[in-house]
Amino acid sequence: MGALEDCIARTREYALERRQFKNNPIAKYQLVQKKLADATTDAAYGILAAYQVGRLKDEGKAAPEMISMIKRQNCDRALINSRVLQEVFGGNAVSDEYHIGRHVANLFVTQTYEGQSDIHSLILGRAITGLQAFV
């Protein structure tokens, strides 16, 4: 979630500085605020969920599927939100100056090295149904 938090901070800063339409900062516009609000909410939920599962693990109460659930959800939401926040930058999103494009690329890669979302879905499916869908 750290990459998403950085995307949120950079997007906020950019949106407050970038001026359009009668010299207003683009942060003034509803869709920019919605994108920031959605991303901030998902980051907060993800961090809180990770802390909770960490506490449960420390107490010996965490099930493996809890880890899969958090990894799957946090990686997916971080990528989705960073892509949405990237839209705020328009063409500047690919500039090295803002780093948001780098974060999106790195988050895309985490879909592979953190264990594909599909694999975590199968682990969760097994926990929910009691049936293993993979060999």
Q: Model-predicted segments: where are they?
A:
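Alpha-helical interface subdomain recognition
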Residues: 1-135
